[in-house]
UniProtKB/Swiss-Prot annotation:
Reactions catalysed according to its record: 5-(2-hydroxyethyl)-4-methylthiazole + ATP = 4-methyl-5-(2-phosphooxyethyl)-thiazole + ADP + H(+)
Gene Ontology molecular functions: ATP binding; hydroxyethylthiazole kinase activity; magnesium ion binding
Disulfide cross-links: none
Name of protein: Hydroxyethylthiazole kinase
Organism of derivation: Acinetobacter baumannii (strain SDF)
Pathway: Cofactor biosynthesis; thiamine diphosphate biosynthesis; 4-methyl-5-(2-phosphoethyl)-thiazole from 5-(2-hydroxyethyl)-4-methylthiazole: step 1/1
Positions that bind substrate: M50, A200
Gene3D superfamilies named in the record: 3.40.1190.20
NCBIfam families: PRK09355.1
Amino acid sequence: MTSTSNLIEQVIEAWQNMQAKTPLVQCITNSVAANYTANVLLASGASPAMIDNPYEAESFTKISSALSINLGTPTSEQMQAMQISAKTAQLNNVPWVLDPVGYGPILAWRSQMTDELLQFKPSVIRGNASEISTLAGNQVQSKGVDSTLSSDQAYQQAYVLLAHADCIAISGESDYILSRELDAVIQVNGGSPLQPKITATGCALGALIAAYSAVTTPTIAALSAHIHFAIAGKLAANQAQTMGSFSSIFMDYIHMLDANLIEQYADIKLLDKQA
């Protein structure tokens, strides 16, 4: 039976493997998040490549360690690249993460494109509570791309999405990870209320899941990335209470994370899986 200590051991191993292998992560992401996402990946030990041109997508996805697709500010050309790269990833066993930013009836075009991307079976679907709940077929009133639903409400509605992906990761006050392979739901605690106030933290989290998925299973990848962010947020909040200083120290701890910090500060709980 899975235990929290065993899961944390696997997270430490995943972190060590990422430092050793420096996975190449292709990011098709939004214009707001691209720079921050690249910096988070570099600070974490991965190698980002922001390749979102449809004419280069197939060849680059083939050589990538992992793929991150984020629908934050999609253009027609980006959408072509997303479809090409997602299909290529599926055909070449490249793990990939789908972040359905803003999914819902208000942003209908991107939502239709998100639905089409599901056919290529992402390794992980990551989003906030409103995005995940709406993607699962529930009617949720969102506030732009921000969530109006709590993560503990959303995870109970998200099981249907396991038909499309190996793992579902939901971020919020506590984070929740659902998986085909586990007989429990993982709750990740930590972080800081300041994290959602920094532009692109959620988007960067999706890319970090992709980086970890290059060196471990989808479930441990999602767990590793969420623990990575939760610890960095918690430790940064101990030193800074304002957004500017918090943002800087948060990035420092993204870079400074190590096995000892994971062992000391990882705060996870196993919940019964819905029947």
